[in-house]
Amino acid sequence: MKSFKLTKEEATMLVQKYATPLEVISLEHIEENYNLLCKHIPRLKVFYAIKANSAKCILEKLIKLGSNFDVASAGEIRLLSKMGVSGEKMIYANPVKTIEGLIEASKVGIKRFTFDSENEIDKIKKYVPDAEVL
């Protein structure tokens, strides 16, 4: 893997051009890291947590690579759905799921859910009766 480093001068030039705050993303490194995980742990299914960084370019790259996604809100579900990601490629993993989120999950066909309490299981069952709870 190639190193990705910015010199102080390069960073200063970027700030002058784009202002702050500034986020510099290496899509090449995202792809390399994704492929390394898949190569060395072949049974692994990658679920990228949108909350980590929802930059459109990152999501587009991961969609192209075939990634799955960890969603935590109705907004994240809608975002991925608009980008063409099916519910089969998502897991709803929020310790306290909203009713809006569960309804949206049911609409797009999300079947996999995590839970942290018995109350969450009851809520999931009510709004997504055919859910798979992990």
Summary of predicted features, one role per range:
Residues 1-113, 118-132:
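A charged N-terminal "starter" segment
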